[in-house]
């Protein structure tokens, strides 16, 4: 049991994914179109979306650089590694 707990803690730290980054993309209930970035847990990349301006959650970043820094991943527009 202790081994499993340690394994999951190490796995979580090694992937470096902030819990906020696992939240779903939420456009919000208002109708603005602010360009923002969110971490897509399916593609494991930061991707652009249009934020409505109200509501939402913590998986909402003003810049691509901020998303990559917080979530520790490449962006969708980054060149693929060989």
Swiss-Prot record:
**Location within or outside the cell:** Secreted; Nematocyst
**What InterPro entries does the record point to?**
Kunitz_BPTI (IPR002223), Kunitz_BPTI_sf (IPR036880), Prtase_inh_Kunz-CS (IPR020901), TFPI/VKTCI-like (IPR050098)
Q: Where is the signal peptide?
A: 1-16
Q: What keywords would UniProt list here?
A: Disulfide bond, Ion channel impairing toxin, Nematocyst, Potassium channel impairing toxin, Protease inhibitor, Secreted, Serine protease inhibitor, Signal, Toxin, Voltage-gated potassium channel impairing toxin
Site (Reactive bond for trypsin): which residue positions?
31-32
Query: Which positions correspond to the propeptide?
Result: 76-82
Record-annotated disulphide pairs: 21-71, 30-54, 46-67
Coiled-coil boundaries: none
Cross-referenced SUPFAM superfamilies? BPTI-like
Q: Pfam families under this entry? A: Kunitz_BPTI (PF00014)
Q: Which GO terms describe its molecular function?
A: potassium channel regulator activity; serine-type endopeptidase inhibitor activity; toxin activity
Cellular component aspect of the GO annotation: extracellular region; nematocyst
Domain BPTI/Kunitz inhibitor spans what residues? 21-71
Quote the CDD domains the UniProt record gives: Kunitz_actitoxin-like (cd22633)
Q: What does this protein do?
A: Dual-function toxin that inhibits both the serine protease trypsin and voltage-gated potassium channels Kv1.2/KCNA2.
Family affiliation: Belongs to the venom Kunitz-type family. Sea anemone type 2 potassium channel toxin subfamily.
Q: What is this protein called?
A: U-actitoxin-Avd3g
Identify the species of origin: Anemonia viridis
């Amino acid at each position: 049991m202790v081994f499993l707990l340690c394994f999951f803690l190490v796995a979580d730290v090694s992937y470096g994914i902030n819990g906020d980054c696992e939240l779903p993309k939420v456009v919000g209930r208002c109708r603005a179109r602010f360009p923002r970035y969110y971490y897509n847990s399916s593609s494991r990349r930061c991707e652009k979306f249009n934020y409505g301006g109200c509501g939402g959650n913590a998986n909402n970043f003003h810049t691509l650089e901020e998303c990559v820094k917080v979530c520790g991943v490449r962006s969708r527009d980054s060149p693929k590694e060989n």
